[in-house]
């Protein structure tokens, strides 16, 4: 048996449950869609002139992907702030998305304070703590998610919440074309490739496992 076909051995090594979170990406996306379907966004948010997403590490990864996928389609500029400070141009016509999986990231909380000072529009993406309390107290739009399908609890493995959730909200605000059709299509594609390239697909029929075997004991270089 190929090692990559030995499920029990892989799970024994995977103490952090990374595999379970990878396999649950479609479930994360489905949960985000279900949670946000009936959510409405303030009309004023759709009229902003620019968007800044404040987040660190995996909490900002969803915005990075959206920027790469939709940069040519969005009618307003999108910038990601991986820092304690927002860009100097942020004002009342800016949408500031505060993205922190934990809800207590100090850089993101610093950006929250700055966004409040300039009366920027604020949207919150978090699973709890300080940002969740602020969202509830101020009745702000956004996504307060319970990551049921991210057992490893790593922000970058919860993209179904941070990335897909932000896609849905941006679609509701009219920044991108993303509604039920696009959401369900994306979920089906994820499920398709999970079946084709997932851990339960045998090495002989699994291109991902075959590539992993070829890369064993090698150092890959990526250019893009």
Annotated model-derived regions:
Residues 1-25:
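Generic N-terminal amphipathic, Lys/Arg-enriched alpha-helix
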Residues 29-33, 73-77, 100-102, 197-202:
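Short, flexible loop segments at the rims of nucleotide/cofactor-binding pockets, characterized by
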Residues 31-33, 55, 82, 224:
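Pocket-edge structural micro-motifs
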Residues 45-191:
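Glycine-rich phosphate-binding loops that contact phosphosugars or nucleotide phosphates
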